[in-house]
Amino acid sequence: DGTVDNSNIHIVNSELKKIPESIMEQFQKNGWHIYVTDADINQKFYQGKYSTVLGTTQYADKKIYIANTSQAATESTIHEVGHFVDYSNGFLSDQEKFKELYLSEVRIYIKAYDAVCVRDRKELFAEVFWQYLTNPSKLQLETPGLYFYMKNTLHTFYSF
């Protein structure tokens, strides 16, 4: 929307390199885009409903917005692409297996990661996607059910 810090764009691009190529190919093929923005995402998309919003995925527009901060670039880029993965595969977070894992492991996940953004299944899916790609050993240790779910799901839909 205005001027953004090039270092944040660099961080976003570095984070995107951690995502399997097959996922990013689908992302691009389906016409999705990622933007670093200096707009207040919380105000622009959520009317100030939340205390802090680092990123958002707008399904209808096929756009992901990342706030113009190093924290947002580091912590929300892969998370937001996780929403794309969830959405692109028919909202995996709404399937029975994930619902069961949500009920059994969400509290453990929130405590282990101090995950303030996890308020529903879709947020948990995106968070688990992020952690699976960046720190799978901790994810497996803390929430093995979510770890194996994500491993099996991603290997079913994508090549690694």
Q: What label would you give each PLM region?
A:
Residues 1-160:
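Active-site-flanking segments in enzyme catalytic domains
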